[in-house]
Design a protein with these regions (language model features):
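Glycine- and charge-enriched loop/helix tracts that form the active or gating conduit
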Residues: 1-123, 221, 226, 231-234, ...
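Charged substrate- and nucleic-acid-binding regions of tRNA-handling and nucleotidyl-transfer enzymes
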Residues: 13, 176-268
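Residue-level detector of short coil/turn "hinge" positions at structural boundaries
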Residues: 24, 75, 127, 144, ...
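A diffuse structural propensity rather than consistent per-protein peaks
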Residues: 25-26, 44, 146-152, 182, ...
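Short acidic/polar alpha-helix capping motifs at helix-coil junctions
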Residues: 28-31, 171-177, 193-194
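Short, mixed-charge aromatic SLiMs
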Residues: 32-45, 92-93, 120-136, 142, ...
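Short Gly/charged-rich anion-binding patches and loops
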Residues: 63, 115, 132, 206-207
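Divalent metal-dependent catalytic cores for phosphoryl transfer on phosphate-bearing substrates
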Residues: 83-182
């Protein structure tokens, strides 16, 4: 181990034998893994992330990652503190799909967005990986209201990640009694989300050109704010045609110069 610190990470990865279960190392190797962990500092961060990704996606991820936490390896590579029988780690095995960022998001649920940024830098995540991590992490702990219009807005803001977000919230609601919502609360929203069958890739019906023609608002921040407001209403009300937008425009008080309170697509 002392010659190749990357073997430390590979040893943990090898413990996960997939369908064959877990191979726990004998005591001599287990002690060596714990005592040589400072050597992980010598390895290129990208290589550590490459190994850690494979561990996170393993069939026995919860058991292996908890062992890494108990052995001090997780603290060494992520510079964050972990609990014994950590709920976040326990939930890794229950997560559907093979998106490794979802697994990081679950692990980092109780840490700050600053911690996530530092971890992204520490593990040298790609720009896309970092963007997905920060976006998803910011949504955790928030539930949309259980109404059709709010759920439509939620779905379009979240894109293809809406259902997975609710599934993750459901897991934490079941295992985290301190939350102010229950597993049933999340399930109701999940049922509504799936029932509505929302097109998350919907585009604004009203272009900037169209709004300028209808309102004589010149190009600038106010035009952008009105376009955002119209798109919000289009999604929330499930409008399908430009005629419906036309009718809507007659009912909105868009003449005021203060656009700070105008709705726009966002969650939370």
């Amino acid at each position: 181990l002392s010659e190749d610190a990357l073997r430390i990470m590979r040893s943990y990865r090898f413990m996960d034998q997939g369908a064959a279960g877990i191979w726990w190392p004998e005591r001599h190797l287990a002690d060596a893994l714990r005592t040589t962990k400072p050597m992980l500092k010598r390895i290129a961060r990208e290589r550590i992330w490459s190994e850690f990704k494979r561990i996170l996606l393993g069939q026995q991820a919860s058991e292996i990652v908890q062992r890494m936490a108990d052995d001090g390896i997780l603290k060494e590579i992520l510079d964050l503190d972990w609990e014994q029988d950590d709920v976040r780690i326990k939930l890794l095995n229950e997560l559907e799909g093979s998106d490794v960022i979802d697994r990081l998001v679950v692990l980092l649920r109780d840490f700050s967005s600053k911690d996530c940024e530092q971890l992204a830098a520490k593990l040298r995540l790609s720009g896309q990986e970092k963007k997905r991590l920060l976006f998803r992490h910011a949504k955790l702990g928030h539930l949309p209201e259980d109404t059709e219009s709010t759920m439509r807005v939620f779905a379009v803001v979240m894109g293809t990640w809406g259902e997975q977000h609710l599934c993750i919230e459901k897991m934490f609601a079941r295992d985290g009694p301190s939350l102010d919502y229950t597993e049933d609360d999340v399930q109701q929203r999940l049922d509504r989300y799936l029932r509505l069958n929302i097109d998350v890739n919907v585009e604004p019906l009203a272009s900037g050109e169209y709004i300028m023609q209808q309102t004589n608002i010149p190009q600038g921040p106010k035009l952008g704010a009105l376009k955002s407001w119209l798109f919000y209403e289009q999604v929330a009300r499930n409008l399908r045609t430009i005629d419906e937008i036309d009718t809507l425009l007659c009912t909105l008080s868009w003449q005021s110069e203060d656009t700070s309170r105008w709705p726009k697509l966002q969650f939370p």
